[in-house]
Amino acid sequence: MDKIFVDEAVSELHTIQDMLRWAVSRFSAANIWYGHGTDNPWDEAVQLVLPSLYLPLDIPEDMRTARLTSSEKHRIVERVIRRINERIPVAYLTNKAWFCGHEFYVDERVLVPRSPIGELINNHFAGLISQQPKYILDMCTGSGCIAIACAYAFPDAEVDAVDISPDALAVAEHNIEEHGLIHHVTPIRSDLFRDLPKVQYDLIVTNPPYVDAEDMSDLPNEYRHEPELGLASGTDGLKLTRRILGNAPDYLSDDGVLICEVGNSMVHLMEQYPDVPFTWLEFDNGGDGVFMLTKAQLLAAREHFNIYKD
């Protein structure tokens, strides 16, 4: 978009609604990729325009006719242009993302929250756990969104948020503090289970890197802005998942449960381990590639994964 185009937008667009409509039109024409919390140009525009004005997403309808200052319009137009030209996810432009109804700070040190596990958390893992968990582990926590959402869902639980990346943990720590959960959620740096004490968790939730080599080579440009450490996991996408399966039973209580997301790599997991009784979970709000295993099932499958123990 050249300067004339920008000047036209700033001079002829006046209200929040004008900016929303213009952003939707620009996004639709640019054929950008959605997948970082939205799946359509309208939601993408809302999540860019309103946070750029320091407004909540659910402003009253009549507020959309509010007029904007020149500096506000320039800020929005600049971000729309960067979203299109540089293919930067909106969450990195606004430093805001939402998960389980909660707002989180994000930047390019962490993945943008989007896991279908959020639906399970909102439902308090109904039908998957036998009792309220007292100790929860969020492995590969990234921004800390899963750990923090679990702390809200289970306010009496202690939650450990583990990641190998100090950059990611810095973001997680910021979010933990912003949500006032420093006494409930503990950030821990560890290479998966390697540096963890042998705590017996009632629930281990993990959204590890799981993108296989083929998919990594073909990712839309938007995903190139995310840390590769949070995406790639070997040729078949299961490098880290195997280690998790090998170590998880030692860290689960007797009635403990592992919930793990592997995305498209579920195909490789089912092909390679047909005898393991993965329970593949279904979602009302879209998403797949998330399985559940109990401690007993993990112990029974140990012959497959013992080689990957730390």
UniProtKB/Swiss-Prot annotation:
Record's signal peptide: none
InterPro entries: DNA_methylase_N6_adenine_CS, HemK-like, Ribosome_uL3_MTase, SAM-dependent_MTases_sf, Small_mtfrase_dom
GO biological process: methylation
Keywords: Methyltransferase, S-adenosyl-L-methionine, Transferase
Reactions listed under catalytic activity: L-glutaminyl-[ribosomal protein uL3] + S-adenosyl-L-methionine = N(5)-methyl-L-glutaminyl-[ribosomal protein uL3] + S-adenosyl-L-homocysteine + H(+)
Gene Ontology MF term list: nucleic acid binding; protein-glutamine N-methyltransferase activity
EC number: 2.1.1.298
Family that this chain belongs to: Belongs to the protein N5-glutamine methyltransferase family. PrmB subfamily.
Its biological purpose: Specifically methylates large ribosomal subunit protein uL3 on 'Gln-150'.
Protein name per Swiss-Prot or TrEMBL: Ribosomal protein uL3 glutamine methyltransferase
Species assigned in the record: Salmonella typhimurium (strain LT2 / SGSC1412 / ATCC 700720)
Origin organism lineage: Bacteria, Pseudomonadati, Pseudomonadota, Gammaproteobacteria, Enterobacterales
